[in-house]
Amino acid sequence: MTEGVAAAPRRHLHAVDLMRVLTVALVVGVHTVTHVPVKDTVAAGALTVVFHSSREIFFVVTALVLMHGYGRRAVRWTDFWRRRYLCVAVPYAVWTLVYMLADGHWRDPLGAFLHTLGGDLLTGGAKYQLYFLLVSMQIYLCFPAIRWLIRATRNHHGWLLGVGAVFQLALSAAIHQQWSPGGLVTAWVHGPDAVLPSYLLYVIAGGVAGWHLDRITAWTLAHRRLVLGATAVSVVATVGIFLLQRLALGETTVDASGVFQPVVVVDSLAIAWTFFTAGVSWVERGMPLRRVVLALSDSSFGIYLAHPLVLMGMTTIAGPLGLLSASTRAPIAVVLVIVVGVMAPLVYGIGALPALLLRRTPLSLAMSGRPQRRTSPAAPAPAAREAVAA
């Protein structure tokens, strides 16, 4: 299980630090909108379908970082898996237990508790965001094959992306329409969230981006307006298709704003590229507020793991205060502004505090997937072009 001795790791990708911060913020936003009692309205659905791109962006970023770090050098795979699984499997098990307790399963008889725990560990069902850790573990397991595919098709990555796009669009249509061809395929279509092939294009796209990172960085810096314009068109198209499905085709808001929408495939890649553009532009400008961004990026996994617990606590407090019932009576525009502009940042900020503090304790690995940090993250102010790919 080895391909020689691993070489020195590649330089840190500072642009990805900002991507992580933005993506986690988008995740917190979509979960705040969808888990606070907001009226089932067209406006809420339109916001949700755009924010759902955060899921796919995570897998693009994961594959990009892996391919950049391990794509062109010898890797001892047993060491790779040991390090990666330690940082994912441990917090996965810990947070599964945390959310079981938070949901009241501590009252269950021991046998029922253990049965639920076993099922949640297998499926990621303890809380709605834990599927990402299961899929991440599948990516790590399959990364030797993913790397081989990217390397073997190095001169044909356009075709590889094209085939991946056709597959992803077809799969998204099947999931959205709940096709039932039979057997394991039906089980997959009806339960796609925690299965790696459900995100194949995003892993391929991230891997290709990591392989061609310098070229993509240079192109992005030279075509920033094009990327932003294409993303704006993509967002408008996403909302337009949502409105068509909701108002003309009679789909429910939940169905029309689902994460496995064919149009979300395009929207996710466009927003991912916009986040990358923001990252490389930030590095080019010398990384202003870099200590804040790097600290939030360093704690982003912990924020991701903890934010549903924060959201549960906030809604529990808001109920007796009458805020939740008021949200069902107030104009939806006002509610969405408060949810996105006030509540989501609060969830993010409150989730960040324990994540930042735990990074300096022995609990860091279990709670945030990172070894204990003894000093604050710091970054030099490198030359702009050199630092973009760092």
Place the predicted regions along the sequence by residue.
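Membrane-interface helix termini and inter-helical loops of multi-pass transporters
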Residues: V38-G45, D108-L117, W179-W188, I216-W219, ...
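Membrane-interface junctions at the ends of membrane-embedded or membrane-associated helices
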Residues: G69-T78, W148-H157, W211-R224, F275-V292, ...
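C-terminal TM-helix exit segments that contain a strictly Trp-centered aromatic cap at the helix terminus
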Residues: W95-R107, A170-Q177, V236-Q245, V310-T315
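Specific transmembrane alpha-helix
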Residues: R55-H68, M137-R147, A173-W219, V263-E284, ...
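Membrane-cytosol interface segments of multi-pass membrane proteins
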Residues: M1-L169, A173, L321-A390
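Signature aromatic-anchored transmembrane alpha helix within multi-pass, membrane-resident enzymes
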Residues: A165, R224-T238, R291
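Interfacial loop-to-helix transition and helix-capping segments at the boundaries
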Residues: L13, A43-R55, L122-V135, H176-Y202, ...
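Alpha-helical transmembrane segments of multi-pass integral membrane proteins
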Residues: Y128, A237, Q245-P362
